[in-house]
């Protein structure tokens, strides 16, 4: 039992030493309806594309584009999923997926998960972010706060 306690303590201490940095992303641009399937008066599927620019707290500015699927049932958004591409200088790219649960949809808050990235910033993969998105007509504004490893932040700063 004593050995087990020591093992858990060692794991806890080693995880406690992993340092993370706040990575802030602000995105803005235009929303365009790509395709819509109207199943009934109350049910549909809409596919949007978002295109615009982003800036971050590492001093970067770049392009962002997203593909968003929205499923509405009984006039209520039941599911929202998106794939987002960030394009930095020198064509360095990072991809994240966005998901919002039913209870988060009206709040405009969800989570991003970085799934792929160029080799030069690959330490960002598996990082999680909380984001908020707001729309005004066909314009969007998104603010995301990510907790990323220090190594990932340094990689992003060096783009």
How would you describe each model-predicted region?
Residues 20-159:
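Beta-strand-enriched cores of mature, soluble protein domains
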Residues 4-14:
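Sec-dependent N-terminal signal peptides
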